Amino acid sequence: MDGGVGIQVLPGGEHAVAVHRGPLERLPTVYVEIMGTWLPSRGRETGRGSPYEIYRTNPETSPADQQIIEVRVPLA
């Protein structure tokens, strides 16, 4: 894995956090909900850094309908 691993500093502070339970194919709807509905309805904006995901289950070994993924979006 030539050059495929590195170090990244994640921003601290507040994050919007949503937990997705279900197939990976539905994960984009979580981003639509956070960015298109949740943030604007609360007068919040994204902060520095990119949104990221924490996979609480292994997508390769867990059934599709039992996936658990946290989506975290840094807030300004």
Language model features with spans:
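A solvent-exposed interaction/effector surface
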Residues: 1-76
